[in-house]
Swiss-Prot record:
The gene is purL. It is found in: Cytoplasm. It catalyses: N(2)-formyl-N(1)-(5-phospho-beta-D-ribosyl)glycinamide + L-glutamine + ATP + H2O = 2-formamido-N(1)-(5-O-phospho-beta-D-ribosyl)acetamidine + L-glutamate + ADP + phosphate + H(+). Mg(2+) binds at D678, E717, N721, D884. Signal peptide: none annotated. ATP binds at G306, A307, S308, T309, G310, S311, G312, G313, E314, I315, R316, D317, A677, S886. In the N-terminal section; belongs to the FGAMS family. PROSITE patterns: GATASE_TYPE_1. This is Phosphoribosylformylglycinamidine synthase. The keyword Chloroplast does not apply. The active site is at C1135, H1260, E1262. It comes from Photorhabdus laumondii subsp. laumondii (strain DSM 15139 / CIP 105565 / TT01). Monomer.
């Protein structure tokens, strides 16, 4: 084993934070230094050249400290016996660089601790602060890392002796293995194996427990019900299915696949030909698939991997729909207990305690959103929608006074995708079809996730809880998705017959489900499964929940094609069995020469005992809302700090919102980029205005008083949100229903039934809405002991509705951004029929009250009329702005609209004279619309036509300035500066950013929000945006070839190819594996573009591993050197491609002074819509654009320029090789965050070579080359955005 020192692992501010935590734990630690250490397992000695190559390969990140570290060593490494995602990717890079002697690379962090005298207990506390026990271990000597490369022998299976010991043996196994089997299931298994005449193996029992867990089988939703001694006619699931029976319109697949599918639009889908790699548009139906999952249990235990794998699993569900589909855009949601931010605690936040094994709500929200965002970012899926709610209180609900809150959190992950018409239905599995696992190797992780998540937190063993959390490797999932994409793009020749994702229960659930759904059985070989931990037992190999895996059936004759696709994409796969005629499962283990599984499928998936729920209805007593102590001004301030209301920038800018080049409406609205969008909208393709919309609705606190009203309100809110998109037909909207409940808690079961009935049997059929997909999580309770007393925290019944719809024209989406350009009017459309209830509202929550009467859907007919009226007004282009009434009520609706428009409001609420407080803070359904004053009569007549005449109230108008004033008649009710409200609203996000990210950056961003004179994003163009300078060359019908270059993990190549294609190029898909294998050479191309993403998951530095695989491979290095030297070529590097090409500067003439691109100053992935200025440089891509100031999409974690010395910066500047700089909204070059999202010196974000043929930039022009994909743009822009000029300039240069 070779040991090689690496770069510093923690920045100064991270060390300061760590020292501060040590102080809180009363540890006498004086200083900490941390650096990466690399361990190389080699099977032959390295030559001097190869040693130098390895040293160079592992030189990345900030410069290595010159001094020898001082202090006591604590070395944190991956758990021995595991192989980390970092290891597998770094090893891949080493092999691609020709270092075949390297068996494996691994990395640890060496912490050098300088401290006073510490006890063993204190060292253990410090150790626990430095590592994650699920994934890591701590050594005290570098040499101990040798254990990382130890090889363990496989552990044999166990048999449970029920034939001799009887039922008690099964009961003991149930506890020891954490199976969570019910008594009748134990009876079922006893009977089944006695009939088979043998003892079950531990593998069979574990597989049965996972496949039949509540998590996988949804027993409660399929149960029979007796409520108040009355047998109920339908199960919960049948009531949900009733929505489809009543309104099957536009639904193509429901209830029987990994995601539901509805009818989409006929558009041109853009992808590369399998024959020659040439990209083009393919006219076809792009149907819409939808899915929303939860990952609550793992997120409570370990938030980052819990949320990350939650998103990853949902993405796999989409990709594994039908015979293969394409995930497109995502959403996330979180419900947690109170944050209690240190030093920023709020008046309504009381500490009720929690069990040790789960993390705090604050830690969940510090880590969980980062995990979810990181997976989406690295996979390449924009995260465009979400919700965030906190609740934790002692309230008088259905079961009397008790603690209600989210110690067991909700972590929601969902999204949309597209699928071809011929692939919606899965194929048949033929006898003899090859059964394949696509994706990464097995590891001893995620065991028992299905069973563990089916229990209330606190019921299972703590070690089992930790074992049930998975690890993430999104770059691996991206590779698998590329394989799936290549397959579905083959149309009728798609080799995938059947596909499922591997989720809860691992292969033990996925493979039986695959063969059973295909009408077959299966014969498998355990040792064919890719395995990174050979010491695992058969149970662990078969049942672990290692992520990023799919199971597929492929016909034998199609196998060579499938294997070739996998090899090109470097996606691991294993053929582990074949389908059999007999519906039987046989798993052979050639190592031990036995059969861990040998059972009929009917025993595993047959008619296990059906659940019966015999429950009683309880009425919530509630209490009248005591308002004597509520001061209006104080109420506003409190509500602005409630997380459900407050600004959520800290949850949004961590997530890429522009990848795919098909995002039309993200969360950020207007020139000031305020996160208040009502819904998310994508284009159906890269050349269309058809699209898809998503919105969310949830009203969980209402359920503490009225279960059914809470469910109806969730549907209603999702509708009032999605109404801002142009959908036309209400029946086009399809819903996902995610139900979270503490089943078995007094009153909750009957309440769940009432809520499902209200939605499935009544409201949705009345509206013509269908719920073709959903999920349930029935164990939303946490138990623990505190000083000998048992305590419980029970979540409210929580229904999260996600609405999905086809969009007729994405350009018609209306946002909350107010306009003051003309005389205007603000109208409130009140669907609450003047009830103005306050039970379960934000106002009640911030005063620690509950109330007794809640908002509700007062009339399904009026709600439908509202949607139809808004659609008509959008079609007539009569709405200037739109925002629904939601958390915080009317006052928050108006405030958020004012924030988006950076303007004042003057509103008269005399309609609420009877109860002004209720009028301002009720959360009854409704919306505020801004219209031209001259259109008021017409708009009111349209609303009246749809039965809303009595619901419409004129409020006032938006006006320039900072005054936010509310009157009741002539009496001033409330006055505050809009800028002050904006800062209150932003303080939660500021405090969270300060804790989580670089506090200096958080402070700068908060300070920027205090600038009331900020003009917002603005545009200055020095060229004619409407001129197509490539048109004359396109008319020649000669398309020069551009190599659209990608490495494993790159995710922005399709939108890049589309931009070049539009400019008149023939875009060719070129994978690095094509160059390394010699399938393709660069000599045939005049233009090369290196695309964005996460090559090798950014291990060994962003883009550096990709670059070194070129620099250290002689044949490929020569190809690039020759290409860059040719005077007739152009080269562009964007984002990850920019980072990669900056490390190839020794090959690029005139690029010797280029910088490297390193970690952002915020130390966070930054997704922003940033303003840049095009500077005077030789860049051929930016010709005739000099002096322009244009917003552009930014999405990166490592974009800060780092020069080797000051002279290199000076040479770059003096030679005018800086091509783009970040500027603030005043047009000044800036290093301030967030106008400069990475902290680059002199605002540098693009550089070019001396002759201008090679340009690299961190922002993404390809994602915003169409106007419709800009988060904000001037009204006069038409089809093309200004960044399209880059690609047309390239075409012009080639003549």
């Amino acid at each position: 084993m070779k040991i090689l020192r690496g770069s510093p692992a923690l920045s100064a501010f991270r060390i300061t934070k760590l020292l501060s935590v040590c102080q809180e734990q009363q540890l006498p630690v004086n200083d900490i230094y941390a650096e990466y250490v690399h361990f190389a397992e080699i099977n032959a000695s390295l030559s001097d050249v190869d040693s130098a190559k390895l040293q160079q390969l592992l030189k990345y990140g900030p410069s290595l400290a010159e001094h020898e570290p001082q202090g006591t060593l604590l070395l944190v490494t991956p758990r021995p016996g595991t192989i980390s995602p970092w290891s597998s990717k770094a090893t891949d890079i080493a092999h691609n660089c020709g270092l075949s002697q390297v068996v494996r690379l691994e990395r640890g962090v060496a912490y050098y601790i300088q401290s006073g005298e510490m006890s063993d207990t204190q060292w253990q506390i410090l150790s626990s602060l430095l590592h994650d026990r699920m994934m890591e271990t701590v050594f005290t000597q570098l040499e101990q890392a040798e254990k990382l490369f130890s090889r363990q022998q496989p552990v044999p299976l166990k048999r449970i002796d029920i034939l001799q010991a009887g039922r008690s043996a099964l009961e003991t196994a149930n506890i020891e293995l954490g199976l969570a089997l019910a008594s009748d299931e134990i009876d079922y298994l006893m009977d089944a194996f006695q009939k088979l005449g043998r003892n079950p193996t531990d593998v069979e029992l574990y597989m049965f427990a996972q496949a039949n867990s509540e998590h996988c089988r949804h027993k409660i939703f399929n149960a029979d019900w007796i409520i108040d001694s009355q047998a109920q006619p339908k199960s919960l699931f049948k009531m949900i299915k009733n929505t489809y029976e009543q309104t099957p319109d536009y639904v193509l697949s429901a209830y029987k696949d990994n995601a539901a599918v509805m009818e989409g639009s006929a558009v041109g889908r853009f992808f590369a030909s399998a024959e020659n790699g040439s990209y083009d548009y393919h006219q076809e139906q792009a149907h819409i698939l939808m899915k929303v999952e939860t990952h609550n249990h793992p997120t409570a235990i370990s938030p980052w991997p819990g949320a990350s794998t939650g998103s990853g699993g949902e993405i796999r569900d989409e990709g594994a729909t039908g015979r293969g589909a394409k995930p497109k855009a995502g959403l996330v949601g979180f419900s947690v207990s109170n944050l209690r931010i240190p030093g920023f605690e709020q008046p309504w936040e009381e500490d009720f305690g929690k069990p040790e094994r789960i993390v705090s709500a604050l830690d969940i929200m510090m880590e969980g959103p980062l995990g979810g965002a990181a997976f989406n970012n690295e996979f390449g899926r924009p995260a465009l929608l979400g919700y965030f709610r906190t609740y934790e209180e002692k309230v008088n609900s259905h079961n009397g006074s008790e603690l209600r809150g989210y110690h067991k959190p909700i972590m929601l992950a969902g999204g949309i995708g597209n699928i071809r018409d011929e692939h919606v239905k899965k194929g048949e599995i033929s006898v003899g079809a090859k059964l394949i696992v696509l994706g990464g190797p097995s590891m001893n992780i995620g065991l028992g996730g299905g069973a563990a998540s089916s229990m209330a937190s606190g019921q299972s063993d703590a070690d089992l809880d930790f074992a049930s959390v998975q690890r993430d490797n999104p770059e691996m999932e991206r590779r698998c998705q590329e394989v799936i994409d290549r397959c579905w793009q083959l149309g009728e020749n798609n080799p995938i017959l059947f596909i499922h994702d591997v989720g809860a229960g691992g292969l033990s659930n996925a493979m039986p489900e695959l063969v059973s759904d295909g009408g077959r059985g299966g014969r498998f070989e355990l040792r064919k499964i890719l395995n990174d931990e050979p010491g695992m037992s058969p149970l662990e190999v078969w049942c672990n929940e290692s992520q990023e895996r799919y199971v597929l059936a492929v016909a034998p004759e199609q196998l060579p094609l499938f294997e070739e696709i996998c090899r090109r994409e470097r996606a691991p796969y294993a053929i582990i069995g074949e389908a059999t005629e007999e519906r039987h499962l046989l798993l052979n283990d050639e190592h031990f020469d036995n059969q861990p599984i040998d059972m009929p499928l009917d025993v595993l998936l047959g008619k296990t005992p059906k659940m019966l729920r015999d429950v009683t209805t309880l009425k919530a007593s509630g209490e009248s809302l005591e308002r004597r102590d509520i001061d209006l001004a104080e109420a506003v301030k409190r509500i602005m700090h409630l997380p459900a209301v407050a600004e959520k920038t800290f949850l949004i800018t961590i997530g890429d919102r522009s990848v795919t080049g098909m995002v039309s409406r993200d969360q950020m609205v207007g020139p000031w980029q305020i996160p208040v969008a009502d819904c998310a909208v994508t284009t159906a393709s890269l050349d269309s205005y058809y699209g898809e919309a998503m919105s969310m609705g949830e009203r969980a606190p209402v359920a503490l008083l009225d279960f059914a009203a809470s469910a109806r309100m969730a549907v209603g809110e999702a509708l009032t949100n999605i109404a801002s998109a142009y959908i036309q037909d209400l029946k086009r909207i399809k819903l996902s229903a995610n139900w979270m409940s503490a089943a078995g808690h007094p009153g909750e079961d009957a309440g769940l039934y009432a809520a499902v009935k209200a939605v499935g049997e009544e409201l949705c059929p009345a509206l013509g809405l269908t719920i073709p997909v959903g999920k349930d999580s029935m164990s939303m309770k946490t138990r623990w002991h505190d000083q000998g007393e048992e305590r419980e925290m029970t979540a409210p019944l929580s229904l999260v509705i996600t609405a999905f719809a086809r969009v007729e024209d994405v350009r018609r989406t209306v946002t909350p951004e107010l306009s003051t350009d003309e005389d205007n009017a603000l109208l409130l459309i009140d669907l609450g029929q003047g009830k103005n209830t306050l039970g379960g509202t934000a106002l009640a929550q911030v005063y620690r009250l509950l109330g007794n009467k809640t908002a509700d859907v007062r009339s399904a007919e009026q709600l439908a009329g509202f949607f139809n009226a808004i659609q008509q007004l959008i079609a007539e282009q009569k709405l200037l702005a739109y925002h629904d009434r939601s958390d915080g009520g009317l006052l928050v609706t108006l405030a958020e609209m004012a924030f988006a428009g950076h303007c004042g409001i003057e509103a008269d609420i005399s309609v609420f004279d009877e109860d002004i407080l209720a009028g301002l803070f009720t959360e009854e359904l409704g919306a505020v619309v801004q219209i031209r004053a001259s259109d008021r009569g017409f708009v009111e007549s349209i609303l009246a036509e749809h039965g809303l005449a009595d619901c419409v109230h004129y409020l006032g108008k938006a006006q320039a300035g900072d005054d936010f004033v509310i009157f009741s008649g002539n009496t001033e009710v409330y006055r505050q500066n809009r800028s002050t409200l904006r800062l209150w609203w932003a303080e939660t996000t500021w405090q969270m950013q300060r804790l989580r990210d670089n506090p200096a950056c958080a402070d700068q961003e908060h300070q920027a929000k205090q600038d009331n004179q900020d003009p917002g994003l603005n545009v200055k163009l020095t060229f004619d945006i409407s001129e197509d300078i490539a048109a004359p060359y396109i008319l020649q019908q000669v398309r020069p070839k551009v190599a659209v270059l990608r490495e494993q993990g790159v995710n922005s190549h399709v939108e890049m190819a589309a931009a070049f294609h539009r400019a008149g190029f023939e875009a060719i898909d070129v994978h690095m594996s094509d160059l390394l294998s010699g399938r393709i050479g660069l000599s045939q191309f005049q233009t090369l573009v290196a695309c964005g993403g996460f090559s090798y998951g950014d291990v060994l530095g962003a883009g550096e591993g990709w670059a070194k695989s070129i620099l250290f491979n002689e044949r490929v290095r020569d190809q690039f050197a020759v290409f860059f030297a040719r005077p007739d070529t152009l080269a562009l590097g964007v984002c990850n491609g920019c980072q990669m090409m900056s490390n190839l500067r020794e090959l690029i003439p005139g690029a010797e002074h280029w910088p490297r691109f390193v970690r952002n100053r915020s130390e966070r992935f930054e997704a922003r819509f940033s303003l840049v200025e095009i500077t005077d440089s030789p860049s051929l891509f930016l010709q005739d654009m000099v002096g322009s100031r244009i917003p552009i999409a930014v999405s990166h974690g490592e974009g800060q320029v780092e020069f080797r010395n000051r002279q290199h910066l000076e040479m770059l500047e003096s030679n005018q090789l800086v091509a783009l700089r970040y500027v603030n909204n005043y047009g000044q070059v800036t290093e301030n965050y967030p106008a400069n999202p990475n902290g680059s010196v002199n605002g540098i974000t693009a550089v070019t070579s001396l002759d201008g043929r090679a340009t690299v930039m961190m922002p993404h022009p390809e994602r915003v080359s169409r106007t419709v994909n800009n988060s904000w743009h001037p009204d006069e822009w038409r089809e093309d955005g200004p960044w399209m000029r880059i690609f047309r300039n390239a075409r012009k240069q080639l003549g």
